[in-house]
Amino acid sequence: DWSSDVCSSDLLAAQAEGTSKLRRPLISRDSELMVAGLKQLGVKIEDSIENGEQVFSVTGGKLKGPAKIDVGNAGTVMRFLPPLASLAEGEIAFDGDPRSHERPLGPVIKALEELGVTVNHGGRYSLPLTLENKGIKEGKKIRGGEIEIDASASSQFLSALLLIAPSTEIGITAKHVGGALPSMPHIDMTVQMLRDFGAEVQVDKKANTWRVAPGKLIAQDLIIEPDLSNAAPFMSIAMVCGGSVTIADWPKQTTQPGDQLREILTRMGANIQFIEGGLKITGGEKIKGIDIDLHDVGELTPAIATLSALAESPSYLREIGHLRLHETDRLSRSEEHTSELQSHSDLVCRLLLEKK
């Protein structure tokens, strides 16, 4: 989800020299937890209104504990903040909602341990945990180096390491080892955000390797794009009810996975076009079924599943097994809601969810 972009920019701004301005940030529980966690680490963040728009002003500086950080059930917070906290002096404790204790975190913890950070997790490799980088007291940076990480359960594992790499002594070269890497567009977003802040990043996708060099980050003045994935339910209304819906400020060029909605919904029968000020979607006479690999855009699955339940032909939504490990089991929830839709309408739910 696009809250990861807000969280990534907050994280990089916390490491940068000067004060960054993040305009039009997405306000959600995830982003609020990230801001609260950064403040616990001593980061100065001011929330203001400029020309009618919300602005976060984030001033980089020395990170320090001790601190107790609530991650809620936010994947970005539980995976992005512990690596950042490893740059801080003092003991940092992390905990969250009961569901957060069940969500995968092991690859991030193991990577931090390889980097020399002490992480106390009771052998569970999950929350709750405390960490401390004892070398920080002596003025030493995390050395960095080559890390192998299995990010097949979440691309956030990889992004979390890349985001702190500029603040290490020799940078980080991260190699993904394991199954297919999900949500590649989110990693592309991380790389672009790093470059926006002045980091040097080399990418070799064939070798599943990302190299981020050490170096100073420079404060930025950024406009955060609207969350395109969140537009999916509203775009679906036009397809289900007829008529048109316009989404304001849809960017013509973006790395967001949600931009694939334009192609996907067109294949399902919608008419979609850019107009002045946004993107207009008009429903067709019928909703068409679709056979599609959603591995890179799993967050779109609930909306596509709902439309598929109302389609005139079967749909096959593939490579979405990793969604069982999100804030909720999104596959089970999608099955529940499409079944409810079937029981409350004369239409047959033709959705087949591939449980890989």
Q: What is the role of each PLM region?
A:
Residues 1-345, 350:
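Short, structured segments at the rim of ligand-binding sites
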